[in-house]
Amino acid sequence: MLWAHCGRFLRYHLLPLLLCRLPFLLLFQRPQWAHGLDIVEEDEWLREIQGATYQLSIVRQAMQHAGFQVRAASVMTRRNAVDLDRPPLWSGSLPHLPVYDVRSPRPLRPPSSQHHAVSPELPSRDGIRWQYQELQYLVEEQRRRNQSRNAIPRPSFPPPDPPSQPAEDARDADAERTESPHSAESTVRHDASENAVRRRHERRRYNALTVRSRDSLLLTRIRFSNQRCFGRGRLRHPAGSGPNTGGPRPGGAGLRQLRQQLTVRWQLFRLRCHGWTQQVSSQIRTRWEESNVVSQTATRVRTWFVERTTFWRRTWVPRQNPAAEAQELAVIPPAPTVLRQNEEPRQQLTGEETRNSTHTQREEVEDVSREGAREGNDGSRASGNDERRNNAGRYDDDHEVQEPQVTYPAGQGELNRRSQEENEEGGPCESPPMTTNTLTVACPPREPPHRALFRLCLGLWVSSYLVRRPMTI
């Protein structure tokens, strides 16, 4: 019992005391450990410390005499007790001394369901800089309006071209026009939100930026641009709206094109505000492609180039590549060779075949004797792999369809064959054609990769000139 008490006393009282005193003991016994770099004599070191302490005390007394208070404050104290209306003592309390408020922001509270979360934050929360930029725009806009109001309207000379559209779309007077029901349906006329709540008989304040803060500067900006496009004082033939985009002089686009352009821009702006996904844009693009705008020439040119580029198409891997098993191959896989016992396999084997190669050799050597029997009942004996390696039989009605017999006049076939042999100069193959039990397979030489790449890029580049491009979103 006594021993337990002693242990507890040691653990709770003596040990912390020792640990508190220990660093100082160590320091003062080994003064050369005080700084890691220079070794100072003990008495010199003590003198230095005492001098520093003395100077500090002098400074502290002087500050207290001048009315300064030096005390440590916690973070919360600093945060709560700084009152900017009545600057504290340590700022010097003279009016010309600036007071810098250094407060760390509050750490974020964890989200809770009890409190209202602002999500997402408005751009105006970024505050002054953003509003300042918007104001720059609005001031500029106002200046432009006033200038154009005072300007003497210059006559357009020569008179603009007659509109290419039917007369319904050409009606463009200063009066607000009454629209036929057809054009009223087709026009997208967007009434942007007003400044304040709309009241019935109240004349609206046309140039007000904000009234009772009903909308942000951003909405005001949208409203101004909308008034410039659709309002009463709108520009009739804005610059950049024509076939040669020279402004009102060279003859502008018809109203229908102009309206379409404006509508498209407006919709794009709405899309950007709303945010859209990859999925939406691909839907738009496929709808565009389905509506037959791609010129057929471009598609055919591109197809021609891509089909002749063999390099990236996959070579045959047994049950990995269904396109290869349908025999749309860059390199046609050679049919299995009949081997004699002492002969090395000449063809290069793929993964699965390499695994079974010895077994296959043994089996095929045995099969040479029964070859006639095997050809008789081929369907019963052939495994899946054999069918896949068999170059004939792409369609199951192949045995019913004969090759068309080409008939030449007398001796012409022989002449054709001879000239073909002379042109080929020893055959089309890099490797000699392998004679198998089925048929002779000649692998076409592979195109070197840089040639293939060049050919593909060239094709895509050429065909891109023949396409009428979609609107990119």
From Swiss-Prot:
Cite the record's Basic and acidic residues compositional bias ranges. Answer: 168-197, 341-397
Quaternary structure (record): Interacts with host MICOS complex subunits IMMT and CHCHD3.
Q: Where in the cell is it found?
A: Host mitochondrion
Keywords attached to this Swiss-Prot or TrEMBL record, sorted alphabetically, are: Host mitochondrion, Host-virus interaction
Give start-end positions of Gly residues composition bias: 243-253
Return the similarity comment: Belongs to the HHV-5 UL13 protein family.
Query: Carries keyword Nucleotide-binding?
Result: no
Q: Where is the composition biased (Pro residues)?
A: 155-165
The segments labelled Disordered in the record are 105-124, 142-201, 232-253, 327-437
Q: Does the keyword Glycoprotein apply?
A: no
Give the main location: host cell
| Gene name in the database record | UL13
Q: Which GO terms describe its cellular component?
A: host cell mitochondrion
What is this protein's function per UniProt?
Plays an essential role during infection by modulating mitochondrial ultrastructure and thereby increasing bioenergetic potential. Mechanistically, alters cristae architecture by interacting with components of the host mitochondrial contact site and cristae organizing system (MICOS) complex.
Q: What is this protein called?
A: Uncharacterized protein UL13
